[in-house]
């Protein structure tokens, strides 16, 4: 078994209602400093979002979303950081790209805004297509009745890739994300994680976003049944990051960059020690 190079993507929510850190980085200066700190801890990419996609969140006015993300993206990009823009709106993505972002992370998988595919094709940037089967303007979070969640999510994602390519997007610029927690039950999420090698086998880079999600909190519930809160799910997130790397994921999107980077370093050292030990034995 080998450890594939993994992109650790730091989450930077410039929002007032995200599920784990809403309101913490609304001030642009605070947001930029947090982005810089995540890069110092090992993040390869900073994913900036100005609208929460948590269950039940009210949609943010596009003008507010723009006002939140543009100054942050501009400053981080000016400092040489690879920035991703987390949005479903083409107008917001365009402004972010003009401000220096190089990746569009679209949780709707291109379904929310028909102008997104032409924009990405014209800009020639990377595009993350996430799976969210019931995504709509109202954003229903009820989990669909999948007959085979792995096969159906895989098919939906590949259909999205085909549609993007047909719209002129470079296939080599696409990344797919199974959308853990988006209109999926905990059982669906675990099935998708277990089937990561099958998703990797599609040949399209895979991004996983399990960080701090509720299905981890449920798994780690206390003896009283209380779901563990988001800030108590970092160890579980780091374990998923390490396992994702072992199974060939392209990237992991996390809130606590250091924990996942540390986990990846430990697993990498463990795996790479074997050949070195054999060499020492032979030389001795």
From Swiss-Prot:
It comes from the Bacteria. Keywords: Folate biosynthesis, Magnesium, Metal-binding, Transferase. Optimum pH is 9. Transmembrane segments: none annotated. Disulfide bonds: none annotated. Its cofactor is Mg(2+). InterPro entries: DHP_synth-like, DHP_synth_dom, Dihydropteroate_synth-like_sf, Pterin-binding_dom. Gene3D superfamilies: Dihydropteroate synthase-like. Residues 6-265 form the Pterin-binding domain. (7,8-dihydropterin-6-yl)methyl diphosphate binds at residues 53, 86, 105, 177, 213, 253-255. The keyword Metal-binding applies. Its EC number is 2.5.1.15. PANTHER family: FOLATE SYNTHESIS PROTEINS, FOLIC ACID SYNTHESIS PROTEIN FOL1. Catalyzes the condensation of para-aminobenzoate (pABA) with 6-hydroxymethyl-7,8-dihydropterin diphosphate (DHPt-PP) to form 7,8-dihydropteroate, the immediate precursor of folate derivatives. This is Dihydropteroate synthase.
């Amino acid at each position: 078994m080998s450890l594939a190079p993994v992109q650790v993507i730091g989450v930077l929510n410039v929002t007032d209602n995200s599920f784990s850190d809403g309101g913490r980085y609304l001030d642009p200066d605070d947001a930029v400093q947090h982005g810089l700190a995540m890069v110092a801890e090992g993040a390869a990419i900073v994913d900036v979002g100005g609208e929460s996609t948590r269950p039940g969140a009210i949609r943010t006015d596009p003008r507010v979303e723009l006002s939140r993300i543009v100054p942050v993206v501009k400053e981080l990009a000016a400092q040489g950081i690879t920035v991703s823009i987390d949005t479903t709106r083409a107008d917001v993505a365009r402004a972010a790209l003009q401000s220096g972002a190089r990746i569009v992370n679209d949780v709707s998988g291109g379904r929310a805004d028909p102008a997104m595919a032409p924009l990405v094709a014209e800009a020639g940037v990377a595009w993350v297509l996430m799976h969210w089967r019931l995504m709509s303007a109202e954003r229903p979070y009820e989990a669909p009745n999948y007959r085979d969640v792995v096969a159906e999510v895989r098919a939906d994602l590949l259909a999205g890739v085909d549609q993007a390519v047909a719209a002129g997007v470079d296939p080599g610029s696409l990344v797919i994300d199974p959308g853990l927690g988006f209109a999926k039950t905990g059982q669906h999420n675990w099935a998708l994680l277990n089937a990561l090698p099958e998703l990797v086998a599609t040949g399209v880079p895979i991004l996983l976003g399990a960080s701090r999600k509720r299905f981890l909190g449920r798994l780690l519930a206390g003896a009283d049944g209380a779901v563990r809160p988001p800030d108590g799910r970092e160890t579980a997130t780091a374990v998923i990051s390490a396992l994702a790397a072992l199974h060939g994921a392209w990237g992991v999107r996390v809130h606590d960059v250091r924990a996942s980077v540390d986990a990846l370093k430990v697993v990498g050292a463990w795996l790479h020690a074997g050949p070195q030990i054999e060499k020492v034995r032979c030389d001795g």
